[in-house]
A protein has these predicted regions:
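Positively charged, amphipathic and often flexible ligand-engagement surfaces
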Residues: 1-234
Length: 234
């Protein structure tokens, strides 16, 4: 029913806001979130600021998301009720570029290289702002086809900003069977280069889509063979 209503542009806010909205959304602005943040802290539960609005992957949409994420990092400065800020790399570039940079780097055009450089600058600017404000920041995990490029930038950011304490955190989806070897590489690199690895563990969020894509494009399934294997990784 909800999907039909959205297709025909039927107004749902009157029903969603008092029900589902209250369960899943802290607020529409940073200031709106303050009440929920303060309420949770009464139970010794810290919050994480996550700008989850879906914007178009246009230059204007990407810039708007980037600027709002910067504001969320500034908002978290000195706020002991907040545990982390977070950003989703695919919201500050395009899916097409992330997939190409991860899987077909040899096919990157001059324009692709320029756009990736701009993406890297935005990525590092968010981490720099987190470092300057002493705010820990989570780099959200994404689809398998995007992750190699994200991992490379996250590794670079950890080497730069995690010298004294963990500021930048990678997110590892442990239903992927390649995440344990990657975790070992992070650890070895941190020891060798003298920084503190920041790692957040999650089980994973895209299993059906990942398996369907692997089958469609005929590459090995990146997901663990069963729940037990995921549990052991996690």
């Amino acid at each position: 029913a909800t999907s039909i209503a959205l297709k025909i542009h039927f107004p749902l806010a009157w029903a969603v806001k008092p029900t589902l909205y209250k369960q899943f959304v802290g607020g529409e602005t940073l200031q709106d979130c303050s009440a929920a943040i303060n309420h949770l802290m009464k139970y010794n539960v810290k919050s994480t600021l996550d700008y989850s609005a879906e914007s178009e992957q246009t230059p204007e949409g990407i810039q708007a998301t980037f600027e709002e994420t910067l504001r969320s990092i500034d908002f978290a400065k000195g706020n002991t009720n907040l545990a982390y800020a977070v950003f989703k790399p695919s919201t500050i570039t395009t899916d097409e570029l992330l997939a190409k940079a991860s899987e077909k780097r040899e096919e990157l055009t001059i324009d692709d290289v320029r756009h990736f450089r701009e993406f890297r600058e935005r990525f590092m600017a968010l981490c720099q702002r987190a470092y300057d404000n002493d705010v820990r920041i989570l780099v959200d995990a994404e689809d398998y086809c995007f992750q190699d490029a994200i991992d490379a930038l996250t590794d670079e950011a950890m080497r730069k900003f995690n010298k004294k304490r963990a500021i930048v955190f990678a997110t590892l989806q442990m239903y992927r069977h390649d995440r344990m070897p990657y975790l070992r590489r992070i650890y070895d690199d941190a020891v060798a280069k003298g920084y503190i690895a920041g790692v957040k563990f999650v089980r994973g969020a895209y299993m059906e889509a990942e398996r369907a894509r692997a089958a469609a494009l005929d590459y090995p399934d990146p997901i663990c063979k069963d729940k037990q294997a995921t549990d052991e990784n996690y």
